Amino acid sequence: FKNGLPDRLIEGGEFTKADYDVRQGRVIQAAHDLVAGGKPCLPPNPDWDQTFMKTLLDGELAAYDDADDNELASIGGGGVHEVKTWTAAFAALRAAGVYQASIDCYHAIPEWLTGMGVMRAVQT
């Protein structure tokens, strides 16, 4: 990274307004390109997202154990780290005891280059 972001994340440092503006500009341009039919990245994949959320809901946490990052990215886009984070969160829930989960909502938002889902879990 030319902007030193990894160093700032690890060692701390200021994320300036100019840094933010550059990043925001890239995201806005990618969203415009995607909506206009361009392909800077994969569009949201609501079917895959909802299947993944249902997998978590059903407690099938090993379902993606054999998938590598490239495979997940080719299906689900750039949110591979989120897949791992959600899976880790549900594994922690399981380790803490019995729980009941629900999918509260999901919306694909192409202009944001993503789908947004909300799940909740309560220990029972």
Describe each PLM feature range.
Residues 2-124:
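Flexible, D/E/H-enriched segments
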